[in-house]
Amino acid sequence: MVWKRTISAKALEKAKSAAVKVEDKVVFIANIKGTLYAMDAVCSHARCILDQLDEEKLTVKCYCHQALFDLRSGKMLEPPYVAPDAPKEKLGLKTYQIRDNGGWIEVDV
């Protein structure tokens, strides 16, 4: 495991979610009622950054073409599915372990 520091827990609590750069990845992180979630932030359809969090449904939507992903599993729930050049098995997005370590949100990449 390689835990990488992202943003402060206080900042995430206030913002509820953020797309953060972690090494060579962009990761969407969220704090919903004290539970932390992390998944790839780049949509598998048109490579846009995910940004529309639905706290009640635990989903995040891509603003470009409205693809919808489950925050817990990374599974795509509503199409469009993938960019024409993307592998067909790449329907969902990778999820990551996430933790609060001394007031900092860390993601295991």
Curated annotation (Swiss-Prot):
PROSITE patterns (UniProt xref): RIESKE
Gene Ontology CC terms: cytoplasm
Family matches, as Pfam families: Rieske
Binding residues annotated for [2Fe-2S] cluster, in chain numbering: 43, 45, 62, 65
Sequence ranges assigned to domain Rieske in this UniProt record: 3-107
TM spans (from-to): none
Cofactor note text: Binds 1 [2Fe-2S] cluster per subunit.
Family under the similarity heading: Belongs to the SDX family.
Annotated protein name in UniProt: Probable sulredoxin
Gene giving rise to this polypeptide: sdx
